UniProtKB/Swiss-Prot annotation:
It comes from the Eukaryota. The lineage of its organism: Eukaryota, Fungi, Dikarya, Ascomycota, Saccharomycotina. PROSITE patterns: DEAD_ATP_HELICASE (PS00039), HELICASE_ATP_BIND_1 (PS51192), HELICASE_CTER (PS51194), Q_MOTIF (PS51195). This is ATP-dependent RNA helicase FAL1. It catalyses: ATP + H2O = ADP + phosphate + H(+). The gene is FAL1.
Length: 399
């Protein structure tokens, strides 16, 4: 796993108390089988967020952890969780919630990989399949960890199909999305929390953490340890950020075709703001003999799974998506992100461009800007204290 430790070391954190920093995984006193899984997964030494947050999670305290995309946040809470659960018991002990089915499934895979030598039983509980399927799988093998979406998990709780009596850890991944107002998850999170034991530990994780979200966490967290990246450290250093002033919406497509012809692309994600735009752009590019796949929330789950599988394996190189793909999905070969539309929610900018340059790799983000988008881009630059440069005339210099 290629990882830029030099860039990772530059990160500066604000913490609510002085923390012990663990320089190695061995210094965390982890289970032997968990260590085997960590090294088997490809980790050599903990990243900045891992060296600070894992031991806090293991200690049982509530934790709020923020770090850049691609620095190992998922492994941070997964390692802490796997260390904490009792493998002798086969009942549900840890619950991970995330905003999309794809992310919930990816987290479940990380749990399986890191827990490969522990015989841990985990399950991805998402929409798109029947509750009977969920029940049959869990009853057959037992289930110590559930990674799911809030709606499906809450439904299982309300039907008394999940026993929450021994749940000792609740993890909210991409917490700004789960606790924000835009997608309607917040009330579901509150309802889930009321069905968990009073002593349940809560871990909140995200790449962005606004003051409003931190305020919301006070309702269900008890004196949490906060590990937050300083604002001017949030931008992703390994990613070159550019814009193309297309002036008019109608000129975006021709600009995209020109880029397509000029750049050498390993894999690319193109973001649009609406499902309708994704379908339109996918059809338009296909008509122009460009090989693309697309994904958004209205697609059937089996179709979304097929798109993800093909993209991960490299069978498809260009994916067009809404923000459903901006959150935490890790495909390491992605080298280019194109914002066909500037994101409507400011925080989604960092999540989108974080799909390139995963775990210290170099990446490129290109933003298509109409005249009416210029003020939005200036707001993004001001908010993240970054400079988005015009695309150079010689495109070979940006790859």
């Amino acid at each position: 796993m290629s990882f830029s430790r030099e860039e990772d070391k530059k990160l500066k954190f604000k913490t609510s108390k002085k923390l012990k920093i663990s320089p190695t995984f061995e210094s965390m006193n982890l289970k032997d089988d968990l260590l085997r899984g960590i090294y088997g997964y490809g980790f050599e030494a903990p990243s900045a967020i891992q060296s600070r947050a894992i031991t806090q999670i293991i200690s049982g305290t509530d934790v709020i952890a923020q770090a850049q995309s691609g620095t190992g946040k998922t492994a941070t809470f997964t390692i802490g969780m796997l260390q904490a659960i009792d493998l002798k018991r086969k009942d549900l002990q840890a619950l991970v919630l995330s905003p999309t089915r794809e992310l919930a499934s990816q987290i479940n895979q990380v749990v399986s990989n890191l827990g490969d030598y522990m015989n841990v039983q985990s399950y991805a509980m998402t929409g798109g399949k029947t509750m009977k399927d969920d029940l049959n799988r869990m009853q057959k093998n037992g289930c110590q960890v559930v990674s799911g979406t809030p709606g499906r998990v809450l439904d299982m709780f309300k039907r008394h199909l999940l026993n929450t009596r021994n749940v000792q850890m609740l993890i909210l991944d991409e917490a700004d999305e789960l606790l924000g107002e835009s997608l309607g998850f917040k009330q579901q999170i509150y309802d889930i929390f009321t069905k968990l034991p009073a002593a349940c530990q809560v871990v909140v994780v995200s790449a962005t953490m606004s003051k409003d979200i931190l305020e919301v966490t006070k309702k269900f967290m008890s004196d949490p340890v906060k590990i937050l990246v300083k604002r001017d450290e949030i931008s992703l250093e390994g990613i070159k950020q550019y814009y193309v002033n297309v002036e008019k919406e109608d000129w975006k497509f021709d600009t995209l075709c020109d880029l397509y012809d000029s750049l050498t692309i390993t894999q690319c994600v193109i973001f649009c703001n609406t499902k309708k735009k994704v379908d339109w752009l996918s059809a338009k590019l296909t008509q122009s003999n460009f090989a693309v796949v697309s994904m958004h929330g209205d697609m059937k789950q089996e179709d979304r799974n097929k798109v993800m599988s093909d993209f991960r394996s490299g069978h498809s190189r260009v994916l067009i998506s809404t923000d459903v793909w901006a959150r935490g999905i890790d495909v390491q070969q992605v080298s280019l992100v194109i914002n066909y539309d500037i994101p409507e929610i400011m925080e989604n900018y960092i999540h989108r461009i974080g799909r390139s340059g995963r775990f210290g790799r170099k990446g490129v983000a290109i933003n298509f800007i109409t005249s009416s988008d210029l003020s939005k881009m200036k707001e993004i630059e001001k908010y993240y204290r970054i400079k988005i440069s015009p695309v150079p005339a010689d495109l070979s210099t940006i790859s």
